[in-house]
């Protein structure tokens, strides 16, 4: 019911920027958010039909592979276990550099904290499939209700607490997925190291500071 765009809007960010402004925001903050309807010019024409259908369609699968930045490295979450290896195979055909495709056994299109997760990782032209659990990273299994957000406001409140250093399932969920992105970027060698770095960033206020600088910059251009 609530996604990344909803969260950023609730945080006070302006996400309706063209490419030139996005470049400036990225250069000054190291972060940007690309609101799909503004950057997939062809996709905007099918949005009304998708909303009327009310179910997942082929367009849910096309999005990650039509990244407007032509990203060579990507973390992709999929909503069905059967799609994980399909996505990594497509990434290989597209000759992408490093891609991590994830699916939680509880049905989440993310690495889950409430259950084990399946991952298909493409790197240097080779695909490796494996399972991970929260325990692999020194974390405990969480409760699904504790990470669920039924509104943008609830999502913002939960993330704000995690960014303020409150440990628990929400912070763990953020850390375990951030870890995959940190591994992709080459900042850490393992996801376990990524979890530790991500938690430190939240507990030391760095994540909150980054969010605030992005929100401020997005409104000043």
Which positions does each model-derived feature cover?
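Short, structured segments at the rim of ligand-binding sites
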Residues: 1-2, 7-10
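Glycine-rich anion-binding loops and their surrounding alpha/beta cores
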Residues: 9-16, 21-221
């Amino acid at each position: 019911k609530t996604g990344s765009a909803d969260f950023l809007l609730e945080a006070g960010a302006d996400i309706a920027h063209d490419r030139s402004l996005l470049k400036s925001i990225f250069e000054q903050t190291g972060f940007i958010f690309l609101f799909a309807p503004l950057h997939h010019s062809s996709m905007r024409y099918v949005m009304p039909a998708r909303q009327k259908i009310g179910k997942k369609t082929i367009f849910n699968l096309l999005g990650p592979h039509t990244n407007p930045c032509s990203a060579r490295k990507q973390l992709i979450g999929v909503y069905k276990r059967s799609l994980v290896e399909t996505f990594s195979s497509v990434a290989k055909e597209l000759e992408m550099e490093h891609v991590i495709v994830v699916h939680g056994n509880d049905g989440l299109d993310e690495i889950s904290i409430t259950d084990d997760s399946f991952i298909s990782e493409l790197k240097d032209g080779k695909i490796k499939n494996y399972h991970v659990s929260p325990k692999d990273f020194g974390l405990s299994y969480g409760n699904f209700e504790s990470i669920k957000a039924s509104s943008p406001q609830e999502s913002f409140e939960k993330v704000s607490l995690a960014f303020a250093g409150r440990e628990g399932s929400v912070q763990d969920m953020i850390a375990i997925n951030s870890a995959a992105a940190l591994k992709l970027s080459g900042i850490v060698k393992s996801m376990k190291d990524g979890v530790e770095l991500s938690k430190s960033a939240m507990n030391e206020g760095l994540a909150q500071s980054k969010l605030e600088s992005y929100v401020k910059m997005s409104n000043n251009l």
